[in-house]
């Protein structure tokens, strides 16, 4: 019997996969526990429509990330921090502070974990911060650190 898996089943198939399985296994386990549905023409059409919808969503997500990248690269975020001799900061400017400043100044919310700022910004001036917006899209945000 051909079935379409609705969930991952260890050793048998992944979600959305169409496979031939024994009739007893399909009726007594997969269909009963709603792990799969029978591969009827209607269900196959529904699966195709769902795959197209998911693909369209992924494409839209990528386009949104590209647009946000262009927007970010045109912006500049200003952050103030206390500094000592020679422009060295007391402590550092973290990705959380940069994300908060971006939200306050430009109304753009980006998760601090998407900013690639391992040790923070430790000096006054301009710094380019890489921001991972999507698997394939990495933008750059210009951060200007000034003395408080």
Swiss-Prot record:
It comes from Macrococcus caseolyticus (strain JCSC5402). Belongs to the bacterial ribosomal protein bL9 family. Binds to the 23S rRNA. This is Large ribosomal subunit protein bL9. It comes from the Bacteria. One of its GO terms (biological process) is translation. HAMAP family: Ribosomal_bL9. GO terms for molecular function: rRNA binding; structural constituent of ribosome. One of its GO terms (cellular component) is ribonucleoprotein complex. Keywords: Ribonucleoprotein, Ribosomal protein, RNA-binding, rRNA-binding. The gene is rplI. Gene3D superfamilies: Ribosomal protein L9, C-terminal domain, Ribosomal protein L9, N-terminal domain.
């Amino acid at each position: 019997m051909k079935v379409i898996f609705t969930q991952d089943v260890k050793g048998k198939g992944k979600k959305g996969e169409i496979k031939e399985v024994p009739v007893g296994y399909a009726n007594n386990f997969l269909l009963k526990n709603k792990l799969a549905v029978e591969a009827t023409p209607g269900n196959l059409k529904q699966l195709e429509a769902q795959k197209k919808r998911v693909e369209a969503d992924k494409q839209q997500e990528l386009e949104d990330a590209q647009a946000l990248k262009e927007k970010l690269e045109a912006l500049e975020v200003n952050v103030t921090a206390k500094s000592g001799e020679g422009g060295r900061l007391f402590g550092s400017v973290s990705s959380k502070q940069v994300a908060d400043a971006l939200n306050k100044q430009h109304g753009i919310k980006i998760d601090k974990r998407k900013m690639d700022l391992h040790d923070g910004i430790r000096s006054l001036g301009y710094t380019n911060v890489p921001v991972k917006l999507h698997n394939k899209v990495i933008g750059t945000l210009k951060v200007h650190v000034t003395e408080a």
